[in-house]
Every structure is written in structure tokens, then in C-alpha cells.
Regions:
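N-terminal acidic, glycine/proline-rich low-complexity segments
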Residues: 1-244
Length: 244
């Protein structure tokens, strides 16, 4: 998949010097937005807590909630479960599928559970759970969350001509425009839907928005990051970030 020319033409062309400056190693106290699917896995909660307790290092402008969902695994999980539990033939057409889901299926069998017993949050449910969990972390640290926490996209991008205008995407835009002469570090530890929507709505923020994204890292964690969950949830958003 490539990004259409009419989309890319909306973005300012940054010089090499500007790009290198934006990507240079930061020093001092920097303005940051944390973009997180906090209710998905415990690492986001640690990241948020560390950020909130690092006021000497980070000027936290706000926290934006991301959607998350494992629904894209559902069909393959059911297929692998059927193959394994019914002793169906394993050949070159399904070997990789079985390998990828073997431990997951085996865990279900040992627990006497069926894939039907697993509930897969929708992206809409995921973003709301993340929003509430962000507030929960603020409260546990006795830090006021008013004006600091924003709901994000309730779904993933379906095309690049219809960005999702949300509290989160607007907040990202507002902060980049408010501080045009400063780098705004948007640290994303989930999918890129909020960030991509902000870019599509206001392409000029590319000038001072620096995205730091956790995705595609080497891992021995079975299955979940095989193809980078943060990347594959919203392929349109991920592709835009690489090409714009």
C-alpha cells in the first residue's frame, strides 16, 4: 500500500536540516504528549506513572487515549483451534498459522475453554477503557487530571480522506500550533490513529511534531507482537507516518 499523491501533496516538504534537527537527541525539559492504550497492557501504566513523576525531565502537556483491539486475531484463533482440537491435517498451507497460535490454543485447552469464551474488546471499548485507566493512574498518584486527559478515536482509519476528528487529534493539533517554535514530542505506545488523524486534519504540524513510537521491536513474547500489534491495528495510520 502506498499513500495517494493528493494526500502527500498536502504536507510541507521539510529540508534535510530541519529533519535532522527534529530528530536530534533532545536535552533539557521537553514538551510531550503521551498517546497510550493504557488499559491494554501493564507497560502503558508504568510509562504513564513514570511520566507523571518525571516533571523535572518532561513538560507533560496532556495524555491522549488510543483505541486497541485484538479482534484481528479472532478468525485465525478459531481456525487454529479447530485444526488442533480436531486433529486436522497440518501442511504447508496452515503450518505457520498453527505455529503462531499453538501456545494460545494449548492454553485454552488446558483451561477447558473455547475461543468463544474469550471476549475481544472493540476499538470503541478499548479507547474508553484506556481513557478511564489514564484518569485512574492520575488519581492514584494524586495528580489533577482536569484538562490533561483526552478521548481518542473510537475506530481505526478506514481511508485517508476521512480523518477522525476527536478530542485527542484536536489536542495534538492545538499544542503543535500553540508552540510553533518548539518541538512537541508525541510519544505513542499504541496504534497511530490519533496522530495520523491530526496530521491529516492539519498537515502543517509536521513542522514541529516529533513522533516517538513503540512498534516493531524484537520480542520473544509469543504472538502478540509478531507483526507489531501497534502497527497492524491501523495500517493506514502506520503507512502515513512512514511516508508523509
Amino acid at each position: 500500500m502506498t499513500i495517494p499523491k493528493h494526500i502527500l501533496d498536502k504536507f510541507p516538504k521539510l529540508s534535510n536540516d530541519k529533519l535532522l534537527n527534529n530528530l536530534s537527541l533532545p536535552s533539557g525539559r521537553n514538551k510531550m504528549i503521551l498517546d497510550t492504550d493504557t488499559a491494554n497492557e501493564i507497560d502503558d501504566q508504568f510509562a504513564l506513572a513514570w511520566t507523571l513523576l518525571s516533571n523535572d525531565k518532561i513538560d507533560l502537556l496532556g495524555v491522549t487515549a488510543e483505541p486497541y483491539s485484538f479482534q484481528h486475531h479472532k478468525e485465525e484463533l478459531f481456525e487454529a483451534y479447530d485444526i488442533i482440537t480436531n486433529n486436522k491435517k497440518i501442511d504447508s498451507s496452515n503450518q505457520e498459522l498453527v505455529n503462531n497460535y499453538y501456545n494460545w490454543v494449548n492454553g485454552l485447552i488446558e483451561s477447558k475453554k473455547h475461543p468463544n469464551d474469550i471476549y475481544f474488546d472493540t476499538p470503541k471499548e478499548g479507547v474508553e477503557k484506556s481513557y478511564q485507566e489514564i484518569i485512574n493512574i492520575f488519581k492514584k498518584l494524586d495528580i489533577n487530571h482536569e484538562g490533561k486527559v483526552f478521548r481518542g478515536s473510537h475506530k481505526y482509519l478506514e481511508n485517508l480522506d476521512e480523518p477522525l476528528d476527536t478530542e485527542s487529534s484536536q489536542f495534538i493539533i492545538d499544542m503543535c500550533l500553540k508552540y510553533p517554535n518548539e518541538k512537541i514530542y508525541v510519544c505513542a505506545i499504541g496504534c497511530l490513529t490519533n496522530i495520523a488523524s491530526a496530521l491529516l486534519i492539519k498537515p502543517e504540524i509536521i513542522k514541529n511534531m516529533v513522533v516517538v513510537w513503540t512498534a516493531g521491536f524484537p520480542t520473544f513474547s509469543f504472538n502478540h507482537n509478531k507483526n507489531s500489534l501497534n502497527l497492524v491495528q491501523d495500517v493506514y495510520a502506520s503507512q502515513l507516518l512512514f511516508e508523509c
